[in-house]
């Protein structure tokens, strides 16, 4: 029986993993085995939030070396990660400058400057990408406006997965789905926008032409001497997660739920109308020529930070306690900039509630309940926005990723959005990474065939919406909070 062994390196903003997938091609039976899981934490050094790229590389190699020591010869290796962040290299392939994180505060206020100079409408028409203060466009504006001798040394700019491609193979490539998150890619031409680069002062030579998922990057020399193929997958983890979401129709929306919540639809055409701009909808690159028409939501980052700050170890007990509390007592707008990276998340939540005349959540369970209720309401808002944009309602929400394990939040989403919710698979980005490799190898015919295979190999859990009494009043409260003009004066900017 023919077998394909595939390695997926899946790097998230808080953790990473090296996974081994085995596909028995005759039966289409797919299994996953976790080889190595590791944390990915921000490092605050030289007054900036940075990624520890050396630690990530060590962990990637730890997983790959373990597979090699097992005597397994992978047919391919693929890497995906979060978007917008980049690495600069000199002519010799050595890193230049700091590996900044998108949560670093050096971009505070930069987006306002750029949009004032270029115009939001003009930028959106060119790129179709939502306005987030940490987009690569604004990171590079901050970099180039504070010039140093380092800039003269730069020869290459690589997104995070492409940097690790380079470290494994020595090949310099730029994969399309991650490049699309930069807000520097032409929506129409799917290549770099020269006018935006000129505005920044970024030389075109820094950037390779984007390649599509499935591109053969090169070979990794394993300790055993084996030469293992490295394939460019949909290297933006959300793009891979969408591949790994077994959507049942074009009337289904996906929600990749983790540190970030990314909700959207799969579309053959982008949406960059004034209505889409007003909703801050993004059109990121997908596989097979599709667009990921979606919206970024702050996601479980809020809960992760609260748990970290308050040393909460038993997440299950916290969720159970939160579920027992009255619903919608205290609400926040999770996408308020103050929640991007405050010194204290629980204090930022309390301050927000106090400023908006709401009960202040004090206990751990009250904080968690506030986060869950607010996220569910924001999910409803985006579901409605997507339906209006496509002139057809969203009829089902498919939740994938780590957050899909939260049964309480899944049911809350179904109740608040008033549509059925399907949850799973948990490792959607890993599976999408694997799917891209299997399609490149010809082991799976196409995206539809891969998703069909997923439904037969990984269980899905269905949540049916229940009627919520007095919901209309809570919804009006949240809608008022989500309007920018309701933010107290001087409180919109990210907390320093």
UniProtKB/Swiss-Prot annotation:
Recorded catalytic activity of this chain's protein: L-rhamnulose + ATP = L-rhamnulose 1-phosphate + ADP + H(+)
Binding residue positions for substrate: 83, 236-238, 296
Pathway named in the protein's UniProt entry: Carbohydrate degradation; L-rhamnose degradation; glycerone phosphate from L-rhamnose: step 2/3
EC number: 2.7.1.5
Matches recorded under Gene3D superfamilies: 3.30.420.40
S-S pairs: 353-370, 413-417
Domain of life: Bacteria
Active site (catalytic residues): 237
Names of the cofactor(s): Mg(2+)
Alphabetic keyword roster: ATP-binding, Disulfide bond, Kinase, Magnesium, Nucleotide-binding, Rhamnose metabolism, Transferase
One of the protein's GO biological processes: rhamnose catabolic process
Matches recorded under CDD domains: ASKHA_NBD_FGGY_RhaB-like
The UniProt record lists the keyword Nucleotide-binding: yes
Binding-site residues, ATP: 13-17, 259, 304, 402
Family per similarity comment: Belongs to the rhamnulokinase family.
Cited HAMAP family: Rhamnulokinase
NCBIfam families in the record: PRK10640.1, rhamnulo_kin
Name by which UniProt lists this protein: Rhamnulokinase
Annotated organism of origin: Pectobacterium carotovorum subsp. carotovorum (strain PC1)
């Amino acid at each position: 029986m023919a077998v394909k062994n595939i390695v997926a390196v899946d790097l998230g903003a808080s953790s990473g993993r090296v996974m081994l997938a085995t596909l028995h091609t005759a039966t289409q039976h797919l299994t996953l085995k976790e080889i190595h899981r590791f944390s990915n934490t921000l490092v605050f050094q030289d007054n900036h939030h940075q990624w520890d790229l050396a630690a990530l590389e060590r962990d990637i190699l730890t997983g790959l070396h373990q597979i090699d020591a097992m005597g397994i010869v992978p047919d391919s290796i693929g890497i995906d990660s979060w978007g917008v962040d980049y690495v600069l290299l000199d002519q010799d392939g050595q890193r230049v400058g700091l590996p900044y994180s998108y949560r670093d505060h050096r971009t505070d206020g930069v987006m306002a400057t750029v949009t004032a100079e270029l115009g939001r409408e003009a930028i959106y028409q060119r790129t179709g990408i939502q306005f987030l203060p940490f987009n690569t466009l604004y990171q590079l504006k901050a970099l180039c406006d504070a010039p140093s001798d380092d800039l003269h040394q730069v020869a290459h700019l690589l997104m995070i997965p492409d940097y690790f491609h380079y470290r494994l193979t020595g090949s310099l490539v730029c994969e399309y789905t991650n490049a699309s998150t930069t807000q520097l890619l032409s929506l129409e031409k799917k290549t770099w926008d020269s006018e935006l680069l000129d505005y920044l002062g970024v030389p075109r030579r820094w950037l390779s032409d984007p390649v599509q998922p499935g591109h053969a990057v090169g070979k990794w020399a394993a300790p055993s001497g084996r030469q293992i193929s490295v394939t460019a997958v949909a290297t933006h983890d959300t793009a891979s997660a969408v591949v790994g979401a077994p959507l049942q129709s074009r009337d289904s929306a996906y929600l990749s739920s983790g540190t970030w919540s990314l909700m959207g639809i799969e579309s053959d055409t982008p949406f960059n109308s004034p209505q889409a701009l007003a909703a801050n909808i993004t059109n990121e690159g997908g596989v097979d020529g599709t667009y990921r028409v979606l919206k970024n939501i702050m996601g479980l980052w809020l809960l992760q930070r609260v748990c970290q700050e308050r040393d909460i170890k038993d997440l299950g007990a916290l969720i159970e306690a939160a579920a027992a509390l009255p619903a919608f007592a205290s609400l926040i707008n999770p996408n308020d900039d103050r929640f991007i990276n405050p010194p204290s998340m629980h204090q930022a939540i309390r301050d927000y509630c106090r400023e908006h005349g709401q009960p202040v959540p004090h206990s751990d369970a009250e904080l968690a309940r506030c986060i869950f209720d607010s996220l569910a309401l924001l999910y409803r808002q985006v579901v409605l926005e997507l339906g209006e944009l496509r002139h057809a309602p969203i009829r089902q929400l498919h939740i994938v990723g780590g957050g899909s394990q939260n049964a309480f939040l899944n049911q809350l989403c179904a109740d608040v959005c008033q549509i059925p919710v399907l949850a799973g698979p948990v490792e959607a980005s890993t599976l999408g990474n694997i799917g891209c490799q299997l399609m490149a190898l010809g082991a799976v015919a196409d995206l539809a065939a891969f998703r069909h295979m997923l439904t037969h190999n990984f269980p899905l859990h269905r949540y049916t919406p229940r009627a919520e009494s007095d919901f209309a009043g809570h919804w009006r409260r949240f809608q008022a909070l989500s309007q920018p003009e309701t933010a107290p004066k001087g409180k919109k900017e990210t907390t320093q």
